[in-house]
């Protein structure tokens, strides 16, 4: 809410919609560019928390050239910590000292552990049981509580513009897409370098005239979507909020 974007900028509308869907359990790695300027200017930030849960996105800004790697590192880091916590929970559940309530909460958590939407309430219920075990002196429970913020399934997103995704950061982006890991990428495709004044990018269309590319682009637009689809296991969607007013 209340971003510092330029008048008429549509990027914030997409970011707002994504955060409304996933924001309570969302990590964002943001490439330097327009989306980092309106997304994290000094002394203020448009990313906020849900008024009921008081939870919201965790946001970080990366350099232009390594945002995909940065976001992938965020994903792998939280995944590793979560896996460590789950291993401790499995050990606790196998103990004859575990309560029936804990075992039931853990079983329910494991049923939804890969579902971002459904897993959050199950994780909260499980944490309540772990706190009881910790109060009773269980050392494994105390270790799990140190990582409790990672228990709920997270939705990890990598944000950036076409200058990052199509050009300077493409190598890293391709590596992340090829990994097959559960990472989401949002490319704000303005079809030129918007933040630096208007240079042509590989997302610019043939013949396109930009402020600092007045002669017109001589080659066609790179099809990033088709490149991603060529792997056969990457889901690709192209969206335009203004395409259908209804």
What are these regions (language model features)?
Residues 143-145, 150-183, 188-246:
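Glycine-rich ThDP/TPP pyrophosphate-binding loop and its adjacent helix/strand module
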Residues 1-5, 61-97, 152, 207-246:
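Conserved thiamine diphosphate
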Residues 20-27, 48-54, 94-95, 150, ...:
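Secondary-structure transition/capping motifs at alpha-helix termini
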Residues 64-140:
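N-terminal leader/propeptide and maturation segments of large enzyme subunits in energy/redox metabolism
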Residues 32, 36-67:
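Terminal amphipathic helices with adjacent charged low-complexity linkers/tails
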Residues 10-14, 21-22, 30, 77, ...:
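General structural feature for long, well-ordered alpha-helical segments within catalytic domains
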Residues 27-37, 43, 80, 84, ...:
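Carboxylate/His-rich catalytic cores and anion/metal-binding grooves
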Residues 2-32, 36-42:
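N-terminal amphipathic, basic-rich helices that act as targeting or association modules
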């Amino acid at each position: 809410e209340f971003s510092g974007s330029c008048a008429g900028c549509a990027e914030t509308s997409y970011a707002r919609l994504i955060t409304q869907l996933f924001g309570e359990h969302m990590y964002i790695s943001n490439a330097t560019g327009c989306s980092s300027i309106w997304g994290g200017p000094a002394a203020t930030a448009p990313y906020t928390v849900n008024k009921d849960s008081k939870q919201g996105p965790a946001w970080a800004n990366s350099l232009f050239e390594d945002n995909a790697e940065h976001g992938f590192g965020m994903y792998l880091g939280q995944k590793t910590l979560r896996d460590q916590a789950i291993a401790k929970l499995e050990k606790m559940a196998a103990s004859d000292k575990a309560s029936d309530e804990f075992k039931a909460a853990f079983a329910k958590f494991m049923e939804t552990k890969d579902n971002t939407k459904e897993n959050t309430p199950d994780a909260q219920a499980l944490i309540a049981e772990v706190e009881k075990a910790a109060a009773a002196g269980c050392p494994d429970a105390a270790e799990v509580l140190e990582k409790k913020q990672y228990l709920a399934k997270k939705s990890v997103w990598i944000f950036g513009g076409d200058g990052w995704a199509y050009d300077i950061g493409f190598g890293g982006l391709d590596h992340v897409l090829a990994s097959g890991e559960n990472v989401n990428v949002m490319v704000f495709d303005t079809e030129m370098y918007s933040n630096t004044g208007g240079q042509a990018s590989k997302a610019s269309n043939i013949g396109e005239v930009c402020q600092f590319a007045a002669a017109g682009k001589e080659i066609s637009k790179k099809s990033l979507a088709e490149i991603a689809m060529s792997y056969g296991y990457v889901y690709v969607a192209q969206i335009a909020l203004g395409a259908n007013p209804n």
